[in-house]
Amino acid sequence: MAANEIRTRFAPSPTGYMHIGNLRTALYTYLIAKHEDGKFILRIEDTDQERYVEDALAVIYKTLEMTGLKHDEGPDVGGPVGPYVQSERKGLYLDYAKKLVEKGEAYYCFCSKERLDILKTNSEALKRPFKYDKHCANLSKEEVQEKLDAGVPYVIRQNNPTTGSTTFDDVIYGRISVDNSELDDMILIKSDGYPTYNFANVVDDHLMGITHVVRGNEYLSSAPKYNRLYEAFGWNVPIYVHCPPIMKDAHSKLSKRNGDASFQDLIEKGYLKEAVLNYIALLGWNPEGTNEILSLEDMVKLFDYTHINKSPAVFDPVKLKWMNGEYVRKLSLDEFHKAALSYYDGVITKENIDLKKISELIQTRVEIFSDIPEMVDFFNELPDYDIEMYTHKKMKTNPEISLDSLKNCLPVIENIEDWNLDNIQNTIMNYIKDLGVKNGVVLWPLRTALSGKKFTPGGAFEIADIIGKDESIRRIKIGIEKLEK
């Protein structure tokens, strides 16, 4: 590790799910490192074995790969300070915890579950947060050794002072002081020999040379305890960047427990990965200037973590949809068509329909790809529709006028020999000109008959071109039949 090198880490738990908040943490962590040409490290925090989900690692790797957040060190690529999976480092945490015991900064706790349950019940009755009562901190060395020799199960707890205060600095929230009387003696090593998340991440951050720690502000309350661990070991404290939460609305946080979308959910709904990443970057950070459409390279160049907002960010699906639309329009026609193909699948089954023409027609109108099936299904099959759709105040049409228009227009369409967009358009526009009526009087009924829908991508000419001459004539005749009833 080079001296003065910026080193950040993304340290997810393998729970099989990449929450939007987790992805933002990964992104900000990546941007802090890359803005300074530093190293971005992936570490897997799997100390909570009960929450471990099979194949969860694959979700993490796939998400980072898809979003372009390439890690410099990690379980799959190695590096100078591995292993990068906490369960593979299990042995070293106990050694560090024992060092704290020797210094009087931690102690063995042999309390039974029953005793702890009584303490918790008493705390609840007094409406106070649970705080361990330091019962085992008062055991003599001999008593401790006797219990260890007898194989009594134990945990190792941090030994926090009960007087004075602990102060720490955070980039976003500034200097924060906490009364030591509020600090619980948190568990460092669990009875199964595994370290707790709180202990392992401090040890690992030090051993891996992490200079900046990015995490959610729900960890602010734990920061004083982390600081005391750094000080107890005589280690440098990293720069803390506690990010505000991402809210679903004014009252509730975005949460996987409430079924809120994960990154993968958004991709499956038809959002582009670049748009999602761009949108997530702006949930708490605003670059200078008005441009909100930013590539990952732009973000690396512009990102300044000292400008992250303190107030919570609200996840706005409407804004995300708009931003996705901006990215969709930036695609080349070939790129758009390739992405759209799976959404045509099973919706458009007729072989004579040119899907590329549909792609060309809808690209500027699509915001998310999952909108496509409902937008294009009428090309394949004319839906049943109400004749009231022929009434349009602005176009000055109603069922009677529409019936006349379709009847008069049908032979004109039947006589078009070379069926292509230009020919269809020129023939019908010349017919309207000769008729001396407003365009809408003919085109509104025609588009309605051809599509059976109130809103369509493209107008009558484009629809007729795509569905073909025979199908166009068939649909116009259905329209006439409906209007004659």
Swiss-Prot record:
Localization: Cytoplasm
GO annotation, cellular component aspect: cytoplasm
Pfam family, one: tRNA-synt_1c
Residue ranges that the Swiss-Prot or TrEMBL entry lists as coiled coil: none
Positions annotated to bind ATP: 256
The enzyme's E.C. designation: 6.1.1.17
Motif ('HIGH' region): 12-22
InterPro entries given in the database record: aa-tRNA-synth_I_cd-bd (IPR045462), aa-tRNA-synth_I_codon-bd_sub2 (IPR020751), aa-tRNA-synth_I_CS (IPR001412), aa_tRNA-synth_I_cd-bd_sf (IPR008925), Glu-tRNA-ligase_bac/mito (IPR004527), Glu/Gln-tRNA-synth (IPR000924), Glu/Gln-tRNA-synth_Ib_cat-dom (IPR020058), GluQ/Sye (IPR049940)
Catalysed transformations (reactions): tRNA(Glu) + L-glutamate + ATP = L-glutamyl-tRNA(Glu) + AMP + diphosphate
Domain of life: Bacteria
Motif ('KMSKS' region): 253-257
TM annotation in the entry: none
GO biological process, alphabetically ordered: glutamyl-tRNA aminoacylation
Keywords: Aminoacyl-tRNA synthetase, ATP-binding, Cytoplasm, Ligase, Nucleotide-binding, Protein biosynthesis
GO molecular function, one term: tRNA binding
Function: Catalyzes the attachment of glutamate to tRNA(Glu) in a two-step reaction: glutamate is first activated by ATP to form Glu-AMP and then transferred to the acceptor end of tRNA(Glu).
Family, as annotated: Belongs to the class-I aminoacyl-tRNA synthetase family. Glutamate--tRNA ligase type 1 subfamily.
NCBIfam families registered for this protein in UniProt: gltX_bact
Quaternary structure, from the entry: Monomer.
Name recorded for this polypeptide: Glutamate--tRNA ligase
Source organism of the structure: Clostridium acetobutylicum (strain ATCC 824 / DSM 792 / JCM 1419 / IAM 19013 / LMG 5710 / NBRC 13948 / NRRL B-527 / VKM B-1787 / 2291 / W)
